[in-house]
């Protein structure tokens, strides 16, 4: 029954396939089965990604916040029953205390999405079962290096201009860029708690519905997908990711205080 409900929530073409301020995978490929066992789908009014960092904890983007969530683990295809598939509800969510959903700029006086501190922890209702298709991934212990080869993944749109959910988990290989490259596009909205990643020639990018998913650079989880330009994958418009090394103390504190 819940797969039928999920099918309704994620109906092809629905605008709510991604939340406001979302990041959106284009130019990628179908991930090898069970190659991203820490990847989860976070289902509320929208579709987001997430990362299993502990059997009881998922990290995702703060702008994926909702009053109710379902977390799908061990899935390659969102719409098919699979042997490693698990489902968990969320006991409690913890947005980063310094996250501000919208800001007003002096130039336009229009609210825009602020990607600073765009992280949220989800405490699962019961621990995930660790299997061949469901595994945790460690938090980073070292700064990522500019120029690193990175992999982003998600079930977000594969079309730069349309919000159409991908049935199969998609992967895309991109590079970690200097923050200056994102500053050229997003101006003062880029800070040292963010990572900039993509391809300057365009054609490869995260897209609608990928928010909250992992950015893995040289085999290490370094970022969480936050946001980017619309349409996705345009030249000279890399995407922004939350820089996890800046938040490990907060993550560990929340997990310790909420056993």
Swiss-Prot record:
State the InterPro entries in the record: Peptidase_S1_PA (IPR009003), Peptidase_S1_PA_chymotrypsin (IPR043504), Peptidase_S1A (IPR001314), Trypsin_dom (IPR001254), TRYPSIN_HIS (IPR018114), TRYPSIN_SER (IPR033116)
Query: What is known about the tissue distribution of this protein?
Result: Found in submaxillary gland.
Q: Write down the top EC class of this protein.
A: hydrolase
The UniProt note on the cofactor reads as follows:
Binds 1 zinc ion per subunit.
Q: Where does Zn(2+) bind?
A: 63, 113, 115
Please give one Gene Ontology molecular function term for this protein: metal ion binding
Every Peptidase S1 domain range: 25-256
Per the UniProt annotation, where are the glycans attached?
106, 189
Question: Span of the secretion signal?
Answer: 1-18
Keyword Hydrolase part of the UniProt annotation: yes
GO CC, one annotated term: secretory granule
Per the entry, what this protein does is: This protein has both trypsin- and chymotrypsin-like activities, being able to release angiotensin II from angiotensin I or angiotensinogen.
Against PANTHER family, the record matches this protein to: KALLIKREIN-1, KALLIKREIN-RELATED
The protein, known as: Tonin
């Amino acid at each position: 029954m819940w797969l039928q409900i999920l099918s309704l929530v994620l109906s092809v073409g629905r605008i709510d396939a991604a939340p406001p301020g979302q990041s959106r995978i284009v130019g990628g490929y179908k991930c090898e089965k069970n190659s991203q066992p820490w990847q989860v789908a976070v289902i509320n009014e929208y579709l987001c990604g997430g990362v299993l960092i502990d059997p009881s904890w998922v990290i995702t983007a703060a702008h994926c916040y909702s009053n109710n969530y379902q977390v799908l683990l061990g899935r390659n295809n969102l719409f098919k029953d699979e042997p490693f598939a698990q489902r968990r509800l969320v006991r409690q969510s913890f947005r980063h205390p310094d996250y501000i959903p919208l800001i007003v700029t002096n130039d336009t006086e229009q609210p825009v999405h602020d990607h600073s501190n765009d992280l949220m922890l989800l405490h699962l209702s019961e621990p995930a079962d660790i299997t061949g298709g469901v595994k945790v991934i460690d938090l980073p212990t070292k700064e990522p290096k500019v120029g690193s080869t990175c992999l982003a993944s998600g079930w977000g749109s594969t079309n730069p201009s349309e919000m159409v959910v991908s049935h199969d988990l998609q992967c895309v290989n991109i590079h970690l860029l200097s923050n200056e490259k994102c500053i050229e596009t997003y101006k003062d909205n880029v800070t040292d708690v963010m990572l900039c990643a993509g391809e300057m020639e365009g054609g490869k990018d995260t897209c609608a519905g990928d928010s909250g998913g992992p950015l893995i650079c040289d085999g290490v989880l370094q970022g969480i997908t936050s946001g980017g330009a619309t349409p996705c994958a345009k030249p000279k418009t890399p995407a922004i990711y939350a820089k996890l090394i800046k938040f490990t103390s907060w993550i560990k504190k929340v997990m310790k205080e909420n056993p």
